[in-house]
Amino acid sequence: MAIGGGGGGGSWSIHGRPDVTSRYEVLGRAGSGAYADVYRGRRRSDGAPVALKEVHDAVSARREADALLAAAPSRHVVALLDHFPGGDHDDDVLVLEWLPLDLSAVVRAAAAARPSAPPAAQRKRWMLQVLEGVAACHSAGVVHRDLKPANLLISEDGVLKVADLGQARILQETGTYQGMHPYEQSSGVEPWVSQQRAVLHGVKENHPSHDSETQTGQEPERLTAADYLHEMDQLRAKSTHGDVDKMSLQDGNASCLATCSTADIDDDPFRASYSYDAEEGMLEEESGAFTSCVGTRWFRAPELLYGSTNYGQEVDLWSLGCILAELFNLEPIFPGTSDIDQIGRIISVLGNITEETFPGCSNLPDYNKIFFNKVEKPIGLEACLPDRSASEVSIIKRLLCYDPTKRASAADLLNDPYFAEEPLPVPIEGLQVPESKDEDDDSTEEWANFRGGDSDSDFDEFGSMDVTKTDKGFSIRFS
């Protein structure tokens, strides 16, 4: 069990919160991480099952609440039902709707059932639900920054919802890069980087719904924006530290590679874990630029791997491509064992990152620090997606491309002709939903054994290595 630091409450402190326990019965721990503990709970007023998320970092908790409210109401984004702000000795507690499964459980169940992979009609419905959730977030100006199968939760009746928005940010204005290519712009704060305080958008872009059935059924009673802002006003009035957005450390625009040493990479105990999370992602971003150390390595966009701190929703679109490719292959498409190995795997498939394939890439912070020999014959996405139709490969190609400005949006993909081809997507009620896992089941152990390489060192996998000192530090060339 992880001990929290942000609010000082630590693990199991939720049991000493009468404001929480008077309204919710705590049934047991459902999961634990470095920055949050999640408990199964029951609302005392009506017996509705809930998830009680005790977040140990106050800023992260409030940003997650802001992002959930901005994206609401959406059938494919998890509902925030209640929020209990923390204090000097307590952590924030977010009350969310209870969803017992995630998309990784669907992938594992399908992999275990090989060679009978999920029918295309089933796979299309899962894909559409993922796209609906991401489109809802993006239309609200939210960039998730940690999309992966484990963060796409599923109800027992098959409704998939985007969840775990603890690393999310809300952009100043919705949409993608506009005007000059972002990596050719000056180093100032761009108009689409995150605000320190989230804006609750009153009008959202409408996307066509692909849910086959009318959305009947009782929606969970959500926390309203007015209620949430009232709670935040009360909290700020009590705070002795001023603006709550200044409670964490500054990121200092440092990239992952710039803030770790060779020893950090060699001793990484999470390198093979399916649920590897970049703990550096909790660093504060007061300077206006984002941190590049966000998300889970296997789903991290190339610009993040090269240290970009100036990006938008396009990083989610790369993650989306990796997720959909995993639905096709039933295994990760780029299972890197380290950041450098991750880049190497991507390059082996798509070829080298150059100004032709990614305009402005030479301006990325770490682009001139790490070099790879030219890949004469990239494997190509077609080879990574065997036995897939041209339409299926096309969807992945529209997402897994180096240039962020050329990645297809989730809203665009909802209208891709692939979903109108036979076989048509099954209705949600026709999905084959895996059985709920036991609360003590650790699904990450199975995936922790999946390793793309057997090397103990990040550098051993690339053969010879040439380190050159430069006026800015050093550069590394692998062969």
Curated annotation (Swiss-Prot):
Catalytic residue list: D146 (proton acceptor)
Catalytic reaction list: L-seryl-[protein] + ATP = O-phospho-L-seryl-[protein] + ADP + H(+); L-threonyl-[protein] + ATP = O-phospho-L-threonyl-[protein] + ADP + H(+); [DNA-directed RNA polymerase] + ATP = phospho-[DNA-directed RNA polymerase] + ADP + H(+)
Enzyme Commission no: 2.7.11.22, 2.7.11.23
InterPro entries membership: CDK, Kinase-like_dom_sf, Prot_kinase_dom, Ser/Thr_kinase_AS
Pfam families assigned: Pkinase
Biased composition (Basic and acidic residues): 468-479
Gene Ontology CC: nucleus
Coiled coil regions, renumbered to chain: none
Protein kinase domain location: 24-419
Residues modified to Phosphothreonine: T291
Enzyme class: transferase
Record: residues binding ATP: A30, G31, S32, G33, A34, Y35, A36, D37, V38, K53
UniProt GO molecular function: ATP binding; cyclin-dependent protein kinase activating kinase activity; cyclin-dependent protein serine/threonine kinase activity; protein serine kinase activity; RNA polymerase II CTD heptapeptide repeat kinase activity
Keyword annotations of the record: ATP-binding, Kinase, Nucleotide-binding, Phosphoprotein, Serine/threonine-protein kinase, Transferase
Annotated region (Disordered), positions in chain: 429-479
Family under the similarity heading: Belongs to the protein kinase superfamily. CMGC Ser/Thr protein kinase family. CDC2/CDKX subfamily.
Name of this protein: Cyclin-dependent kinase F-1
Upper classification of the organism: Eukaryota, Viridiplantae, Streptophyta, Embryophyta, Tracheophyta
